[in-house]
């Protein structure tokens, strides 16, 4: 199923019971978070709060609160089918030359589809049906959530931030939280290595003293939202990738006040600039780690204009101790990562980011081990392969006889195949998420790799244990007599 815009997606979810409307008044201050947290932990539906206290604009929350809804948003019917999305990304990341005429012919539809997915520019876009300018620009008119008791201010959580560097042909989409400072100002919390921050830095070097144009999209079609959190190859824009997922070109319209382009069917768009040198102290906020993060300075985004559809919908979420929506997204996108990793390291059998690991801080990988030291090669390969894994603190490597999605199996491998000194790899002074207060220095800390594979000659001088396995014929005989046993 493909979706033209957010409302189309919501309509389809509602028909299948995957979206429920809440008609009673609910406060954006804390109440909304508590309701969403309970619903998400129960693997419940997306919620449309029709009467946020003090506001006329409804709030859509818990949209991607189950892996199934993430898959549906990507145009697939099941989480397992996301492997096909990963295979497509792996091919686009490193396309292989055709092995012959037939292979070239087979690959032609994919290449043609990619070329045909350049975004389509439109005018008279729905997202500009209503325009607030001047004194009308007031963020308090939007039902922005105040998620946790210790949060310093309301927080924009699902904003797709659109930027463009001076030397790039394509725009960048990123999701960065934004603390509300006043009627027309928010703090743009982007980390230094993220696309938006890189675009801003390059713009400042090329245009000293000039304001940097930014647009923030609040609520758009699911393919575009998910494209912004997927490891899209640098040769492909997130808008193009969204078109591939959707099976139709992403329709864009130009912002009123800048050359940036935003989804034409977006619900709400914030247009404005970041002035060089204008910074503010951000936080504290409850984060996906389950703790309040420490404060840090980030650029201030000044909003000149707010455009929206008629009867707009505000898309929101919260972050907290797993499971939360980012953790659920991590579980689903895990299936996209597997083919990408297997393309680079064919010996990888499976890869898993347990949601308890705060989306990316711990990874477990199973391999077809082929030589001594193989596990260590995989550890360093994963840490350096995708930007998403730069902050992974712990990697556990096991053999292909272990189901890495079953903690009982993983712990058995760790306790029977590991020696603490020999099989632990520690790496110091590596990039760490600055939100990780456990690291000795903000943004810099250590990583740990655990080799829980069977050891080969060269890794041990001892005779290695053989796992106990029941005779296959006996298992079959017991299977056939099981009903008769009356157990």
From Swiss-Prot:
Query: Per the record, what are the reactions this protein catalyses?
Result: a 4-hydroxy-3-(all-trans-polyprenyl)benzoate + H(+) = a 2-(all-trans-polyprenyl)phenol + CO2
Cofactor names from the entry are: prenylated FMN; Mn(2+)
EC no.?
4.1.1.98
Topology class, membrane: Peripheral membrane protein
Give one GO molecular function term: 3-octaprenyl-4-hydroxybenzoate carboxy-lyase activity
Keywords in UniProt for this one?
A: Cell membrane, Decarboxylase, Flavoprotein, FMN, Lyase, Manganese, Membrane, Metal-binding, Ubiquinone biosynthesis
Kindly give the InterPro entries that the UniProt entry links to this protein. Answer: UbiD, UbiD-like_C, UbiD-like_N, UbiD_bacteria, UbiD_Rift_dom
Annotated compartments: Cell membrane
Q: Name one GO cellular component term.
A: cytosol
Identify the metabolic or biological route this protein is part of: Cofactor biosynthesis; ubiquinone biosynthesis
Q: How is the cofactor bound?
A: Binds 1 prenylated FMN per subunit.
> Which positions in this protein are listed as binding prenylated FMN?
175-177, 189-191, 194-195
Q: Which GO terms describe its biological process?
A: ubiquinone biosynthetic process
Where is this protein primarily located? membrane
Annotated active site residues, numbered on this chain, are 287
Q: Which residues does the annotation say bind Mn(2+)?
A: 172, 238
| Domain of life of the organism encoding this protein | Bacteria
* Assembly with partners or alone: Homohexamer.
The record's similarity note reads: Belongs to the UbiD family.
Alphabetical list of NCBIfam families matching this protein: PRK10922.1 (NF008175), UbiD family decarboxylase (TIGR00148)
PANTHER family cross-referenced by the UniProt entry: 3-OCTAPRENYL-4-HYDROXYBENZOATE CARBOXY-LYASE-RELATED (PTHR30108), FERULIC ACID DECARBOXYLASE 1 (PTHR30108:SF17)
Q: What this chain does, per the record?
A: Catalyzes the decarboxylation of 3-octaprenyl-4-hydroxy benzoate to 2-octaprenylphenol, an intermediate step in ubiquinone biosynthesis.
Q: Name it.
A: 3-octaprenyl-4-hydroxybenzoate carboxy-lyase
Species per Swiss-Prot/TrEMBL record: Dechloromonas aromatica (strain RCB)
């Amino acid at each position: 199923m493909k979706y033209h815009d957010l409302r189309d997606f919501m309509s389809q979810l509602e028909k299948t019971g995957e979206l429920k409307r809440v008609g009673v008044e609910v406060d954006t201050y804390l109440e909304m978070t508590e309701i969403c947290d309970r619903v998400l932990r129960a693997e419940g539906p997306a919620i449309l709060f029709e009467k946020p206290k003090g506001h006329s604009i409804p709030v859509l929350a818990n949209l991607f609160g189950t892996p199934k809804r993430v898959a549906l948003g990507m145009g697939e019917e099941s989480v397992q089918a996301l492997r096909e999305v990963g295979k497509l990304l792996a091919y686009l990341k490193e396309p292989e030359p055709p092995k012959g005429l037939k292979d070239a012919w087979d690959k032609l539809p994919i290449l043609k589809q990619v070329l045909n997915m350049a975004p389509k520019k439109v005018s008279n876009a729905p997202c500009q049906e209503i325009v607030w300018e001047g004194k009308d620009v007031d963020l308090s008119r939007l039902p922005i959530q105040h998620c946790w008791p210790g949060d310093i201010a309301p927080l924009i959580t699902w904003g797709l931030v659109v930027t463009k560097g001076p030397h790039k042909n394509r725009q960048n989409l990123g999701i960065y939280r934004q603390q509300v400072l006043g009627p027309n100002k928010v703090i743009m919390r982007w980390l230094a290595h993220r696309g938006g921050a890189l675009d801003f830095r390059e713009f400042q070097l090329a245009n000293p003293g000039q304001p940097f144009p930014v647009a923030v999209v609040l609520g758009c079609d699911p393919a575009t939202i998910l494209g912004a959190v997927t490891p899209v190859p640098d040769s492909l824009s997130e808008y193009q990738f969204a078109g591939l997922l959707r099976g139709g070109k992403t329709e864009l319209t130009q912002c009123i006040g800048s050359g940036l382009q935003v989804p034409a069917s977006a619900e709400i768009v914030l247009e404005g600039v970041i002035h060089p040198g204008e910074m503010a102290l951000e936080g504290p906020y409850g984060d996906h780690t389950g703790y309040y993060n420490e404060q840090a300075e980030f650029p201030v985004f000044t909003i000149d204009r707010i455009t929206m559809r008629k009867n707009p919908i505000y898309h929101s979420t919260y972050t907290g101790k797993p499971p939360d929506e980012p953790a659920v997204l991590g579980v689903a996108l895990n299936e996209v990562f597997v083919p990408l990793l297997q393309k680079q390291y064919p010996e990888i059998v499976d890869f898993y980011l347990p949601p308890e690991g705060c989306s990316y801080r711990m990874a477990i990988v199973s391999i077809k081990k082929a030589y001594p030291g193989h596990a260590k090669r995989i550890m360093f390969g994963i840490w350096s392969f995708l930007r998403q894994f730069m902050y992974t603190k712990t990697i556990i490597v096991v053999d292909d006889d272990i189901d890495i999605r079953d903690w009982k199996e993983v712990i058995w491998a760790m306790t029977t195949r590991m020696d603490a000194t020999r099989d632990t790899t520690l790496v110091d002074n590596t990039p760490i998420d600055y939100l990780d207060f456990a690291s000795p220095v903000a943004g810099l800390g250590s990583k740990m790799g655990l080799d829980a594979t069977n050891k080969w000659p060269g890794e041990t001088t001892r005779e290695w244990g053989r796992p106990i396995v029941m005779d296959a014929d006996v298992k079959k005989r017991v299977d056939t007599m099981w009903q008769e046993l009356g157990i």
